[in-house]
Amino acid sequence: MILQETYTLSNGVKIPKLGLGTWFIPDAQASEAVRTAISLGYRHIDTAQAYENEAGVGEGVRTCGLPREQIFVTSKVAAEHKDYDSAARSIDETLEKMGLDYLDMMIIHSPQPWADFRGGDYAEGNRAAWRALEDTYTAGKLRAIGVSNCRKPDLDNILSDCRVRPMVDQILLHISNTDLGLLDTCTTQDILVEAYSPIAHGEALKNPMIVEMAARYGVSAAQLCIRYVLELGAVALPKTADPEHMKANATVDFTITPDDMELLKQTAPIKDYGEFSFFPVFSGK
């Protein structure tokens, strides 16, 4: 069962292959969503400072009835923190807000502030933020550290001047958005890829080819999308607060044939994410 399967990070820490994404889940609903997911077998919860629901997520983890060490909890340093002091301070604030003594992983949310996504040169700021993560990791408050939305030059920048190598790169990865070059780079550097929005924020469900292929496998289009990123060797982080969707998203114990995987890898890119296109990560940059 996928909820019991894990990958092993470069430092030996095990991370569940399937997690609950919490983007767009309001803080007031987050604790219940987390408790529900954990009751259904989820052991991996992903949040971020920018989601503004860390308090609720932390409450859900603390009150789920399971020992803390059984739940893998990730948060993200806000994209705007591009200096050591603000990044370090934000990590401590996250721990306090969540009511947790440690996080299983903390990652830099973006190599650029959202207002300048894929814009200016923030290499020095990213190295400074990374040092804050390294120091917090060394202090034992974080079990693993990584990055998000990083391309090869961003990764090279961190790798050129680090004491602890990034363990993950959490990226937009789904059918119709598969950067094979970046996946190869991460594999070469022993960086695990995590896929946020593996269902393309719902847009993949509108693709007739995906719907038809899913029917051939006897699964939903969403399940095919989640299985796809798992077949690529990535962590899947579908977001939902709906218990039925949580159950369905975890029912992915099937295999996509190599031929179908090749077809899915070559699916034409999504050019329009509908009402969510204004978000920088969906802008095509």
Task: Please identify what each model-predicted range represents.
Residues 1-71, 200, 284-285:
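N-terminal binding-site loop/beta-alpha segment at the start of enzyme catalytic domains
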Residues 10, 58-68, 95-100, 159-162, ...:
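Acidic (Asp/Glu)-rich catalytic clusters
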Residues 17-28, 77-84, 117-119:
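Active-site mouth loops of central-metabolism enzymes
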Residues 25-37, 83-98, 153-156, 177-178:
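Short, acidic/polar
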Residues 42, 100-103, 142, 166:
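A structural motif
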Residues 68-81, 102-111, 173:
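A short, structured active-site edge motif that brings together acidic residues
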Residues 87-108, 135-139:
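CE4/NodB-like, metal-dependent polysaccharide N-deacetylase domain
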Residues 113-285:
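Beta/alpha (TIM)-barrel catalytic core signal, keyed to glycine-rich beta->alpha loops juxtaposed to Asp/Glu
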